[in-house]
Every structure is written in C-alpha cells, then in structure tokens.
Curated annotation (Swiss-Prot):
Its EC number is 2.7.2.3. It is found in: Cytoplasm. The lineage of its organism: Bacteria, Bacillati, Actinomycetota, Actinomycetes, Mycobacteriales. ATP binds at residues 215, 303, 334, 363-366. It comes from Mycobacterium sp. (strain KMS). Substrate binds at residues 27-29, 43, 66-69, 125, 165. This is Phosphoglycerate kinase. It catalyses: (2R)-3-phosphoglycerate + ATP = (2R)-3-phospho-glyceroyl phosphate + ADP.
Length: 407
C-alpha cells in the first residue's frame, strides 16, 4: 500500500502538527444491548492508538464515526453518547460529544478546541449525505467536515470496517484534505497483503455465518487458493440441502442450492462440510440441544451448531495449516448450548498459531465470538476490525477508502 501513514503526518518536518485540526474517521460501530450498554468495546479499543498519538502531539482531534443504520436522520437509539463515554475511559482523556454532525454545536465546539483536545461528532449517518449515491451531496458533507478542521487540517483514515464504502467521511473527505492511513488501517492492510501475496501452505479457510449469498464471492475466490475450506454456520445447511440431505427447519436459501451444488462439484476436494449437527426444536437459548448426523436432521428441528465430530475433523484439517483465515461463527455462539462448535474451531486455530501458523480472524461476529467465549486474543496473529472490508479485499475488489488514500 503506497500511502502516507500517521507517522508521516506526525514527523512532517515542514508542518508542525500541534495546533492543527485533524479529522479522524474511526470505526466505533460497537454492539449495544437493549439498555444501550456496549457489549463489546473491541473497536473502541482498536481506535485508541491513533487518537492518542495525535492528541499527545497537540493536534486538535475531531473524530467522526457511525453507529448502526439510522434511517436518514437523528435517532436517539443510535446516538454516540455511550461511545463518547467509553472512548473517554479508554483514551484516558475527556472526549467531548457534539450535539450534531456538522451543525452549529459541532462548529462552536470545533472552534473552541485547544491543542490535544478530542471532539467526537454525533453519528455521521444522522446526515443522509454520508451514504448518498449522489457524488455532489457527499462532497457537500465532506466540505462541511473540512470547515470543522480548517483549511490547514489533515484527514486520517482509521476506520478499517468502513473502507469498502464510498461514503463522504471515508472517501470524499480524502479528496479534499492531505490524507493519511491511521495505525489501525495501515496494520489491517499489511496483514491482508500478507494473506493474499505470500501465503505459506497449507492454507486453511474457515467460513461461517448464516447466508451463502453474503459469502459467495469470497467462497469462489478462496476455494481456488486454499488447500481446505471449512464451511459451518447457518450457510452449511444450503450446501447440505444441495446434496439432497433433508435439513429439517434449518436455515436454507433455496435460490442458492444450485450454486452450492456447482461449488461442491468444482471444489469438492477443497470444501469440507460438517458431519454432525447440534439441533433444537426452536431458535432459543434454552432450547434442548441434541447432536445428530448431518444427514439425519429431524423434520421438526433446526441446526444451531456443528457437532463434536465435525469439530474433531476440522481440528485435524487446521492442525497442520501454516496460514488460516477465519470469518464467521460455526453456530449460534451467543447461546451457550450452541457455542461449542465455534469455540472448538477457534481453539484449533489457536493451536495452529502456537505451532507457527499465521492466523487472521476476519472481524465481525468472529471477533465478537473470540471475546465473548473468553478466548485469548493474542492466540491469533491478527484480529481484524472489519468483516465486510476483509472479505472484499480477499475477493480482489478495490476498496474505495484505501484506493483514495493512494492518490
């Protein structure tokens, strides 16, 4: 990645960073419970090094980020208020929260910043221009963001989870200000470059999640490159159904059955499916679990996890791997009775890593599972903060938020 980094900005001999406005696009899109409490602060923690370095250097730091998918306007449910409190705690310094995105409160607070201050703008997606398909509308929002940091300001892209989006605070802003990759984005891209260019073999890929359609492009791409591709999670049932197996009430995408059959016909020696399944009569944390063979799922039950024999087989595949990429849980890990498959496969990846494998957890639910199941995060070589961005990179797609940094 031929881009300028945070180090270049901090060590620019021509322009002192102290006193300058710096807009940082962070990824602070953390999960909240029904009471609005943060359940996994991983992305907030990952954003700290860049913000800390800038504040320590005396920059006037303005952070922009989103939370959830508000529908085109302010919604208290998606306010960054709990994020600002958590960020203050993790950063060890007060983080102001603006009452709007680029309105009068944001402007007044930006003008009042002193060296080393940190201001978090309210949810950028409260402004519909952020996600507009209209280039002109997005540019107008980007221009309003420039006004907050000033003409001598800079932009630091540090939200890896959004670099696959062509949005005002990710893409358009970088066309208007001197731009740099933050610590997190630079590290993420370096890892993915390593994963795509110099892969040590055997190369094992573990894919989970609920829908085949969400992962189709990455399955097609990685099946050509990997030595083994393990499929679990809800999407394994569409693959099983494509082989004429009855999967009961399990999640199936009927429109993807032919595609799954073709994938198995083409890459049958690479793709590995579960051989046993943990089923239950309903999707519930206290549903009674039962382990059955993958081709013996009762009509009145649904699969909610892979079984112990599948974990054993997948562990054997992973034990000799030199490179591992994992994206997506093996089952409904949020329910303790259906978490063993995800935990078992994760432990197998940790075991391979301990023997020298290079392992990458591709963000999203997999990263949440690692933390929720109490697994050692340092047991993996890298845990990404961006699920969708990681997948699109591995598919070979151009990521707009990275592409623009290279210009």
């Amino acid at each position: 990645m031929a881009v300028k980094t945070l180090e270049d900005l901090l060590n620019d001999g021509d322009r002192e960073i102290a006193g300058r406005g710096v807009l940082v696009r962070s990824d602070l899109n953390v999960p909240l419970d029904d009471n609005g409490a943060i359940t996994d602060p991983g992305r907030i923690i990952a954003s700290v090094p860049t913000l800390e370095a800038l504040a320590e250097a005396g920059a006037k730091v303005i952070v922009t980020a989103h939370l959830g998918r508000p529908k085109g306007g302010p919604d208290p449910k998606y306010s960054l208020k709990p994020v600002a409190a958590a960020l203050s705690e993790k950063l060890g310094r007060h983080v102001q929260l603006a009452g709007d995105v680029v309105g009068t409160d944001a402007l007044a607070r930006a003008e009042g910043l002193t060296d080393g201050d940190v201001l978090l703008l309210e949810n950028i997606r409260f402004d519909p221009r952020e996600t507009s398909k209209d280039d002109g509308e997005r540019r107008k929002l980007a221009e309003a963001l420039v006004e907050l940091v000033g003409d001598d300001g800079a932009f630091v892209s540090d939200g890896f989870g959004v670099v696959h989006r062509k949005q005002a605070s990710v893409y358009d802003i970088a066309t208007l200000l001197p731009h740099y990759a933050g610590t997190l984005v630079a590290a993420e891209v370096k890892v993915l470059e390593q994963l795509t260019s110099s892969t040590d073999r055997p190369y094992a890929v573990v894919l989970g999640g609920s829908k085949v359609s969400d992962k189709l492009a990455v399955i097609e791409s990685l099946a050509k490159k990997a030595d083994s591709l393990v499929i679990g999670g809800g999407m394994c049932f569409t693959f099983l159904a494509s082989q004429g197996v009855s999967v009961g009430k399990s999640l199936v995408q009927p429109e993807m059955i032919d595609t799954c059959r073709e994938l198995l016909d083409t890459y049958g020696d690479v793709i590995h499916l579960p051989v046993d399944i943990v089923v239950a009569p309903e999707f519930s944390a206290d549903a009674e679990p039962e382990t059955v063979a993958a081709d013996r799922i009762p009509e009145d039950k649904m699969g909610l996890d892979i079984g112990p024999e599948s974990v054993k087989r997948f562990t054997n595949l992973l034990s000799n791997a030199r490179t591992v990429f994992w994206n997506g849980p093996m089952g409904v890990f949020e329910f303790p009775a259906f978490a063993a498959g995800t935990k078992g496969v994760a432990e197998a990846i940790i075991g391979a890593t301990a023997k020298g494998a290079f392992s990458v957890v591709g963000g999203g639910d997999s990263a949440a599972a690692v933390r929720q199941l109490g697994l050692a995060e340092d047991g993996f070589s890298h845990i990404s903060t961006g699920g969708g961005a990681s997948l699109e990179y591995l598919e070979g797609k151009e990521l707009p938020g990275i592409q623009v940094l290279e210009s």
